Amino acid sequence: MLQPHLVIGSAFTFGDAFFTLFAFAILLVLIRIYAWKPLMGVMKEREEHIGSEIDAAEESRAQAEQLLAEQKSVLQQARVESQTMIENAKQLGEKEREEIVKTARRESERIKEEAKTDIAREKEDAISALREQVGSLSVLIASKVIEKNLDEKEQSNLIQDYIERLGDDK
């Protein structure tokens, strides 16, 4: 049959409560020794592992940010260098253009001066030839007028005299 202390609804006794409390305390001590400490060790290892993974991820992120900043710096420096090269090329091109223009102007001035010199020389040659022709024609006309032939010396003196008068008239 049933024993009275096992029946539901039986009376509560202090001994049963003390025994239950003592058994529960022993169970807690055993759980703490054999289950809780290993479980806490595993949890602590897991926490440390997750912490180290987070630290590694943060370090990787910091390295990635540093690398990104370095790449941005290198890219900016390359942009500045390329802009400087472009500006230098523009300035060099402008200087070369100015030098070419100066050289062309000097050459045109030189050609112009040569042309002026050539024109002046040709003018002098033409005037000289014209004077000689005028002198010869004058002598020829004069000799026909006076109907006598002049010798070479008289002709030369007459031409020289006529040329000097012609030069004085101008």
Swiss-Prot record:
<keyword id="KW-1003">Cell membrane</keyword>
<keyword id="KW-0406">Ion transport</keyword>
<dbReference type="InterPro" id="IPR028987">
    <property type="entry name" value="ATP_synth_B-like_membr_sf"/>
</dbReference>
<dbReference type="Pfam" id="PF00430">
    <property type="entry name" value="ATP-synt_B"/>
</dbReference>
<comment type="similarity">
    <text>Belongs to the ATPase B chain family.</text>
</comment>
<keyword id="KW-1133">Transmembrane helix</keyword>
<comment type="subunit">
    <text>F-type ATPases have 2 components, F(1) - the catalytic core - and F(0) - the membrane proton channel. F(1) has five subunits: alpha(3), beta(3), gamma(1), delta(1), epsilon(1). F(0) has three main subunits: a(1), b(2) and c(10-14). The alpha and beta chains form an alternating ring which encloses part of the gamma chain. F(1) is attached to F(0) by a central stalk formed by the gamma and epsilon chains, while a peripheral stalk is formed by the delta and b chains.</text>
</comment>
<dbReference type="GO" id="GO:0005886">
    <property type="term" value="C:plasma membrane"/>
</dbReference>
<keyword id="KW-0066">ATP synthesis</keyword>
<keyword id="KW-0813">Transport</keyword>
<keyword id="KW-0138">CF(0)</keyword>
<dbReference type="InterPro" id="IPR005864">
    <property type="entry name" value="ATP_synth_F0_bsu_bac"/>
</dbReference>
<protein>
    <recommendedName>
        <fullName>ATP synthase subunit b</fullName>
    </recommendedName>
</protein>
<dbReference type="GO" id="GO:0046961">
    <property type="term" value="F:proton-transporting ATPase activity, rotational mechanism"/>
</dbReference>
<keyword id="KW-0812">Transmembrane</keyword>
<dbReference type="GO" id="GO:0046933">
    <property type="term" value="F:proton-transporting ATP synthase activity, rotational mechanism"/>
</dbReference>
<dbReference type="InterPro" id="IPR002146">
    <property type="entry name" value="ATP_synth_b/b'su_bac/chlpt"/>
</dbReference>
<keyword id="KW-0472">Membrane</keyword>
<feature type="transmembrane region" description="Helical">
    <location>
        <begin position="11"/>
        <end position="31"/>
    </location>
</feature>
<keyword id="KW-0375">Hydrogen ion transport</keyword>
<dbReference type="InterPro" id="IPR050059">
    <property type="entry name" value="ATP_synthase_B_chain"/>
</dbReference>
<dbReference type="GO" id="GO:0045259">
    <property type="term" value="C:proton-transporting ATP synthase complex"/>
</dbReference>
<comment type="function">
    <text>Component of the F(0) channel, it forms part of the peripheral stalk, linking F(1) to F(0).</text>
</comment>
<comment type="function">
    <text>F(1)F(0) ATP synthase produces ATP from ADP in the presence of a proton or sodium gradient. F-type ATPases consist of two structural domains, F(1) containing the extramembraneous catalytic core and F(0) containing the membrane proton channel, linked together by a central stalk and a peripheral stalk. During catalysis, ATP synthesis in the catalytic domain of F(1) is coupled via a rotary mechanism of the central stalk subunits to proton translocation.</text>
</comment>
